[in-house]
């Protein structure tokens, strides 16, 4: 399973990329707004760091405008993937962009039917938001399993990016289901390294090593 970092923060991206464990980056307008940098310059900087898919969101709501925006975004780098909301105009735009060879990521997906439509129009990625479903007392990871089954049934090539991840267990469950990608905040990515028993074991080993004659 591939791991993407869900941020637009350059320092976080540099650190995560240097570890050799991430394969791409996902951004959204909220991430971008926090960085206090010009939009295009920020995206270009991210592309200069990460040699992998970089999801950038189109903010238009009409299909024709989404297509125009996507065409401009795709000129920044061949690694750009255009995020498009799972609405009627977005699905319409994704079909056009797929035919033009522009990579797309259908985002804000909360139902199997939305994911089915993304697969039908040939979207490159689909992003089910598991954590937000959990926030309203639904089991978000079940949506991922449903999408995986639908795509398997019909041979859709659209890749599943498990999004809105709230904790490391979401990542593990996504991997067990067979999702293609999990995208997560920097702090959650860092938490994948940690287990208290690892810390205790390492502490004991180091103490014992000090007893070894040098």
From Swiss-Prot:
<keyword id="KW-0963">Cytoplasm</keyword>
<dbReference type="InterPro" id="IPR013785">
    <property type="entry name" value="Aldolase_TIM"/>
</dbReference>
<keyword id="KW-0570">Pentose shunt</keyword>
<dbReference type="InterPro" id="IPR033919">
    <property type="entry name" value="TSA/FSA_arc/bac"/>
</dbReference>
<dbReference type="GO" id="GO:0005975">
    <property type="term" value="P:carbohydrate metabolic process"/>
</dbReference>
<keyword id="KW-0808">Transferase</keyword>
<comment type="similarity">
    <text>Belongs to the transaldolase family. Type 3B subfamily.</text>
</comment>
<dbReference type="Pfam" id="PF00923">
    <property type="entry name" value="TAL_FSA"/>
</dbReference>
<dbReference type="GO" id="GO:0004801">
    <property type="term" value="F:transaldolase activity"/>
</dbReference>
<dbReference type="InterPro" id="IPR004731">
    <property type="entry name" value="Transaldolase_3B/F6P_aldolase"/>
</dbReference>
<dbReference type="InterPro" id="IPR022999">
    <property type="entry name" value="Transaldolase_3B"/>
</dbReference>
<feature type="active site" description="Schiff-base intermediate with substrate">
    <location>
        <position position="83"/>
    </location>
</feature>
<dbReference type="GO" id="GO:0006098">
    <property type="term" value="P:pentose-phosphate shunt"/>
</dbReference>
<dbReference type="InterPro" id="IPR001585">
    <property type="entry name" value="TAL/FSA"/>
</dbReference>
<comment type="pathway">
    <text>Carbohydrate degradation; pentose phosphate pathway; D-glyceraldehyde 3-phosphate and beta-D-fructose 6-phosphate from D-ribose 5-phosphate and D-xylulose 5-phosphate (non-oxidative stage): step 2/3.</text>
</comment>
<protein>
    <recommendedName>
        <fullName>Probable transaldolase</fullName>
        <ecNumber>2.2.1.2</ecNumber>
    </recommendedName>
</protein>
<dbReference type="GO" id="GO:0016832">
    <property type="term" value="F:aldehyde-lyase activity"/>
</dbReference>
<keyword id="KW-0704">Schiff base</keyword>
<comment type="function">
    <text>Transaldolase is important for the balance of metabolites in the pentose-phosphate pathway.</text>
</comment>
<dbReference type="GO" id="GO:0005737">
    <property type="term" value="C:cytoplasm"/>
</dbReference>
């Amino acid at each position: 399973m591939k791991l993407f970092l869900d941020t637009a923060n350059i320092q976080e991206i540099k650190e995560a990329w240097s570890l050799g464990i991430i394969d791409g980056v996902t951004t959204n307008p909220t991430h971008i707004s926090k960085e206090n940098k010009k939009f295009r310059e920020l995206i270009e900087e991210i592309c200069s760091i990460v040699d992998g898919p970089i999801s950038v969101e189109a903010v238009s709501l009409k299909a024709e405008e989404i297509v125009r925006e996507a065409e401009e975004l795709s000129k920044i780098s061949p690694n750009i993937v255009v995020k498009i909301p799972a609405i009627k105009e977005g699905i319409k735009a994704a079909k056009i962009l797929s035919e033009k060879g522009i990579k797309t990521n259908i985002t804000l997906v909360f139902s199997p039917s939305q994911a089915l439509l993304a697969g039908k129009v040939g979207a490159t990625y689909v992003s089910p938001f598991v954590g937000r479903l959990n926030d309203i007392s639904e089991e978000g990871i079940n949506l991922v399993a449903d999408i995986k089954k639908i795509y398997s049934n019909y041979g859709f090539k659209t890749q599943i990016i498990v999004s809105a991840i709230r904790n490391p267990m979401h990542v593990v469950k996504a991997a067990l289901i067979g999702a293609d990608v999990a995208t997560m905040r920097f702090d959650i990515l860092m938490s994948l390294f940690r287990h208290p028993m690892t810390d205790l074991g390492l502490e004991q080993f180091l103490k014992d090593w000090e007893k070894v004659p040098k």
